[in-house]
Structure formats: structure tokens, C-alpha cells
A protein has these predicted regions:
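Active-site-proximal alpha-helical scaffold in enzymes
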Residues: 51-81, 116-150, 190-196
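Beta-strand segments within the central parallel beta-sheet cores of soluble alpha/beta enzyme folds
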Residues: 15-24, 45-48, 75-80, 136-142, ...
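Conserved small/polar residues in nucleotide/adenosyl-binding loops
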Residues: 217-219
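Conserved catalytic cysteine-centered active-site region
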Residues: 24-78, 82-118, 156-182, 214
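N-terminal extracellular/periplasmic Venus flytrap/periplasmic-binding protein-like
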Residues: 139-215
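Generic structural marker for isolated residues within well-ordered, non-membrane alpha-helices
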Residues: 4, 32, 123
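Conserved AMP-binding/adenylate-forming core of the ANL superfamily
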Residues: 1
Length: 219
């Protein structure tokens, strides 16, 4: 609720201006109807999709679709997660581990726990098919660190080079330590609405020009 409230204030919106909510499940989700009730928001549409990682970008595409379809006018995309202090991927000991349910019984029980482990085969396949190099993959971290250095709210503001990433230790071949993201406690919200409505908000709008999707095959 804190993230959504702040996002509405930042945009100059009130609870009655928001009529859609989207989020994604990740072991500790709070579903939209409960969040909306706490904020005084009346929903015409909500969805909690299964996923993680890039689900936020996918939800932006879904928000565009439901707005274009006339199902709602303004969508709050939110997620709050105690990714460090509470549920940890593959966690043991003092911090609880992610529970094993559903299709996870086919891989979690055999040690396939984290996002790094799950995506490493995809990187290897991409390298095999297209000749992608570790240096090209490292460029993602370099770009992210540049953006973080300009973000006052970023956890880590140090800029990294290609060599820094390549020389960090291997976590899951071909991914290095600096290729992997940091588990953090966080809450965030993105508000998506029509361009004409966004122009009336406090800040200049960020225009979403397009979205793209893919079908992921690990091996």
C-alpha cells in the first residue's frame, strides 16, 4: 500500500482515479482486492500472474491491453517483497526457504533452486546458437551500473566495466557473480494510463511505445 500510495501522490492521482491493479505471485504476494480495499480503490480489473523477474515488464504490456480494451482506465502495477530479510531463494537456516509446490517438485528437489540456475542453460543455448559472448552478456551489468550510479535510491552506485564482470567468480556457468542480481527488500509501483490522462499528471509522462514477448525454452 505504501508504494501505491506514493505512486499516486507522485502522479497527482487519487484512489478513485485508479480502477485496475496488476501484480505477480512470488510466495508472499498480497492479492489486489485486499490491497485495493485498504487504499479505497474500486477495481474494474485485476490480475495476479505467476512469475518473477521480468514479470513487471510483461504486466506493463497487459496493462496497455486492458486499457485499450476499455476494461479500465488506469492501472497500478505493484509488488512488495522481502527478498532479503524473509523468504530467500534456496534459503536455509535462520531465513526460510521458498516452499516446493506444483511443477517445482520436478526440479527444486534436485537442486535447481535459483533464477541463476534456471536461466544459465538459456544463456548457454543462446551462446551456442548465436555466438553470444560472456563479454556481451556482461554489457548488461555495465549498463545497469551506469543507470544505478545516477539513481539516488539505488543500493549500489559503483560503475562496473566489462573486465570487472568477467573477472568476478563464476556462479552458474556462464553467469558470473556480477551478472546476477541482488536480493533486496523492496516495494514499488508503476502507474499506467492513457496518454491524454497522463498529460494531466504532475510529471511529464513516459510514453510506452511497444512491448514484446517470448516463449522461453531452457534447453
Amino acid at each position: 500500500t505504501w508504494a501505491i500510495s506514493n505512486a499516486m501522490v507522485d502522479a497527482g492521482m487519487k484512489p478513485e482515479d485508479v480502477d485496475g491493479m496488476l501484480s505477480y505471485s512470488g510466495n508472499d504476494s498480497t492479492h489486489a482486492p485486499w490491497v485495493a480495499g485498504d487504499l479505497g480503490i474500486r477495481l474494474n480489473f485485476y490480475m495476479d500472474v505467476h512469475g518473477g523477474g521480468s514479470s513487471t515488464e510483461a504486466l506493463i504490456g497487459i496493462a496497455m491491453g486492458v486499457i485499450e480494451a476499455g476494461m479500465c482506465k488506469t492501472v497500478a502495477i505493484y509488488r512488495a517483497m522481502n527478498g532479503y530479510s524473509a523468504v530467500r531463494i534456496g534459503g536455509t537456516g535462520a531465513r526460510s526457504a521458498v516452499p516446493i509446490t506444483g511443477d517445482q517438485i520436478h526440479h527444486r528437489a534436485y537442486g535447481w533452486q535459483s533464477a541463476g540456475q534456471m536461466f544459465a542453460p538459456t544463456f548457454l543455448r543462446h551462446m551456442y546458437d548465436y555466438g553470444t559472448t560472456p563479454e556481451q552478456v556482461a554489457g548488461v551489468k555495465v549498463a545497469h551500473s551506469k543507470h544505478a550510479s545516477n539513481n539516488p535510491k539505488a543500493y549500489y552506485k559503483k560503475r562496473y566495466t566489462i573486465d570487472d564482470v568477467i573477472n568476478s567468480r563464476i556462479i552458474f556457468k556462464p553467469l558470473h557473480l556480477l551478472d546476477c542480481c541482488v536480493e533486496t527488500d523492496n516495494a514499488t509501483c508503476i502507474i499506467v494510463t492513457r496518454t491524454e490522462r497522463a498529460r494531466d499528471c504532475i510529471h511529464p509522462p513516459a510514453v510506452i511505445q511497444s512491448v514484446v514477448g517470448l516463449s522461453l525454452i531452457h534447453i
